[in-house]
């Protein structure tokens, strides 16, 4: 099993896809890394030899990945909250940050609906 950046890559997937299992690497960056290391997109992680794995590890050192990237993102969010900018306020209130509508939708960010009782009808006497 190939292990890169602390992540076990799936053995049967194409290398182009397998690299995307690492947090911080998407399809574009995966292709970029494979081109730089002269490794085929179609090779499977189980078929990589030690030289190719060493090249990949060396190439991955140039990027912030996994825990470092997660910490950096969290630090950026904390900084925005502390300085009190608009994005920080939206994070603090658990609302969408990038200008999306909130009258309807935004349920992922806001959580489940909080049901509010309607006005009761007056009974006849």
Swiss-Prot record:
Designated name of the protein: Small ribosomal subunit protein uS13
Keywords: Ribonucleoprotein, Ribosomal protein, RNA-binding, rRNA-binding, tRNA-binding
KW rRNA-binding (keyword) present: yes
UniProt xrefs under Pfam families: Ribosomal_S13
Superkingdom as given in the UniProt entry: Bacteria
Function: Located at the top of the head of the 30S subunit, it contacts several helices of the 16S rRNA. In the 70S ribosome it contacts the 23S rRNA (bridge B1a) and protein L5 of the 50S subunit (bridge B1b), connecting the 2 subunits; these bridges are implicated in subunit movement. Contacts the tRNAs in the A and P-sites.
Annotated region described as Disordered, given as residue ranges: 92-125
Alphabetized InterPro entries for the sequence: Rbsml_uS13_C (IPR027437), Ribosomal_uS13 (IPR001892), Ribosomal_uS13-like_H2TH (IPR010979), Ribosomal_uS13_bac-type (IPR019980), Ribosomal_uS13_CS (IPR018269)
Species name: Saccharopolyspora erythraea (strain ATCC 11635 / DSM 40517 / JCM 4748 / NBRC 13426 / NCIMB 8594 / NRRL 2338)
Subunit structure: Part of the 30S ribosomal subunit. Forms a loose heterodimer with protein S19. Forms two bridges to the 50S subunit in the 70S ribosome.
Entry keyword annotation includes 4Fe-4S: no
Gene3D superfamilies in UniProt: 1.10.8.50, 30s ribosomal protein s13, domain 2
GO cellular-component term (any): small ribosomal subunit
GO biological process, one term: translation
SUPFAM superfamilies referenced in this protein's UniProt entry, alphabetically: S13-like H2TH domain (SSF46946)
Family affiliation: Belongs to the universal ribosomal protein uS13 family.
An example molecular function term from Gene Ontology annotations: rRNA binding
């Amino acid at each position: 099993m190939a292990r890169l950046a602390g992540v076990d890559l799936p053995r049967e997937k194409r290398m182009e896809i397998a690299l995307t299992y690492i947090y911080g690497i998407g399809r574009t960056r995966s292709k970029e890394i494979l081109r730089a290391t002269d490794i085929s997109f179609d090779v499977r992680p189980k078929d990589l030899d030690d030289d190719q794995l060493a090249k990949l590890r060396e190439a991955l050192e140039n990027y912030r990945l996994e825990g470092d990237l997660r910490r950096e993102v969290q630090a950026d969010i904390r900084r925005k909250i502390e300085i009190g900018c608009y994005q920080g306020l939206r994070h603090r209130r658990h609302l969408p940050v990038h200008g999306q509508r909130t009258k309807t939708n935004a349920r992922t960010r806001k959580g489940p609906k909080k049901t509010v009782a309607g006005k009761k009808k007056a009974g006849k006497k």
